[in-house]
Amino acid sequence: MKYIEVDEELYRHIASKTEHIGESASDILRRILGLQVESVVQDAPEEISHPSLERVSPKPVKVAKVITKMTSTAVSDFTSLIDADVLAAQKGAVGRFLFILDTVHRASPVQFEQVLQIQGRDRLYFATSKDALLKASKSANPKEIGQSGFWVTTNNNTAKKRTILSEVLLQFGTDEAQVTDIIEKI
């Protein structure tokens, strides 16, 4: 496996051509270029540079804590549980993605463990620890979903976040119309 750097516009174009969760960049490029999609033996790199993992001291961020009493019974109508004002106040797509996942967790904490089944072909999206996601992918950029104890990888583009959230909502029995409405809020 070789690693290359691409500019943002090219990255977005390639990512927009994703057809299913877990599809690799190589598979997407092979499809775009009309090459045969086949299994290729991938050599592991000796060392990978991860500039995105280098940390600069973060500025303190004020976090508004929203506490809503939820029941532990199964919930499939999440649209009414999402506070539009609080959602709009979230920072970027990652903030909105995490907020909606936290809302799902608070609505059905007992059933939330089923999100651990959502995985890509070679990709882990959810785990119960930051280390598990980092072990699966050094560039996962894991974030905790509220105070749930569940972690999600956040280094995906917005389209992939929507696909992941769609899978989560469908597992909870949310109807297609609501899923579409909710994922568009990211």
Swiss-Prot record:
Species of origin: Shewanella halifaxensis (strain HAW-EB4)
Subunit and partners: Homodimer. Polymerizes to form helical filaments.
Pfam families: SeqA, SeqA_N
InterPro entries registered for this protein in UniProt: Arc_rbn_hlx_hlx (IPR013321), Ribbon_hlx_hlx (IPR010985), SeqA (IPR005621), SeqA_DNA-bd_C (IPR026577), SeqA_DNA-bd_C_sf (IPR036835), SeqA_N (IPR033761)
UniProt-annotated stretches for the region Interaction with DNA: 93-94
UniProt protein name: Negative modulator of initiation of replication
Record Gene3D superfamilies: Met repressor-like (1.10.1220.10), Replication modulator SeqA, C-terminal DNA-binding domain (1.20.1380.10)
Gene that encodes the chain: seqA
Subcellular location: Cytoplasm
Its job: Negative regulator of replication initiation, which contributes to regulation of DNA replication and ensures that replication initiation occurs exactly once per chromosome per cell cycle. Binds to pairs of hemimethylated GATC sequences in the oriC region, thus preventing assembly of replication proteins and re-initiation at newly replicated origins. Repression is relieved when the region becomes fully methylated.
Key words, A-Z: Cytoplasm, DNA replication inhibitor, DNA-binding
Alphabetized GO MF terms: DNA binding
Any one GO BP annotation for this protein: negative regulation of DNA-templated DNA replication initiation
Family in the record: Belongs to the SeqA family.
